[in-house]
Amino acid sequence: MDYIKGIAFDLYGTLFDVHSVVGRCDEAFPGRGREISALWRQKQLEYTWLRSLMNRYVNFQQATEDALRFTCRHLGLDLDARTRSTLCDAYLRLAPFSEVPDSLRELKRRGLKLAILSNGSPQSIDAVVSHAGLRDGFDHLLSVDPVQVYKPDNRVYELAEQALGLDRSAILFVSSNAWDATGARYFGFPTCWINRTGNVFEEMGQTPDWEVTSLRAVVELFETAAGKAEKG
């Protein structure tokens, strides 16, 4: 993997657990937290795809709020303004997966350029990584806002290529979202899919270059490659 000089990470679901909002959802609607979180995430993604197709962009914070409104209406829950604000705020304070902080530090020590490439707005990306104390670990926090379209549009992946100043073949794209990894693979990024939950990959004509179960396993890919290079 010595040809890899930079890594672009998806944020939501890859580095940070989107379902860490379950607790807040349970506080607002006891016993309904998991149900709310699952549908909220589903609709959030659907709204980004639909808005891209319709060329009707709103930023991710708005799409997230719209998805929450739908979720509560669908589940017959009364979402007042205060609860809506509290739950949307929870998306700015997501918890990183447990192995993420140490893994990012190890990748950084290897001299790799690190970027986040996210559907999130600049403010929401910064809020999430700063709340977790991880802001200094990244060279770039890249939002879709400049191109006003969501992943998996090629214009989004181009943002990472431009910001990192590397050819796409030298940028490893890491995502836990199979649809995102598929889009990145079609764009030309070497791609690593973090399959935390034992899912099957999308049937869309592409497969990831690597499939792992955690970010720590991404570090191990580089360690293994370095060990082989030393022996070779």
Swiss-Prot record:
Domain of life, source organism: Bacteria
Resulting phenotype, residue 151 to A: Loss of catalytic activity
Keyword Hydrolase: yes
Reported effect, residue 177 to D/I: Loss of catalytic activity
Outcome, altering residue 41 to K: Severe reduction in catalytic activity. 4-fold decrease in substrate affinity
Site feature: Important for catalytic activity: 14, 151, 157
Active-site residues annotated for this sequence: 10
Reported impact of residue 41 to W: Loss of catalytic activity
Applied uses, from the record: (S)-2-haloacid dehalogenases may be used for the biodegradation of halogenated substances and their derivatives which are widely used as pesticides, herbicides and other industrial products.
Keyword Lipid metabolism: no
Recorded consequence of changing residue 180 to N/E/S/G: Loss of catalytic activity
Subunit structure: Homodimer.
Protein name per UniProt: (S)-2-haloacid dehalogenase
Organism: Pseudomonas sp. (strain YL)
Taxonomic classification: Bacteria, Pseudomonadati, Pseudomonadota
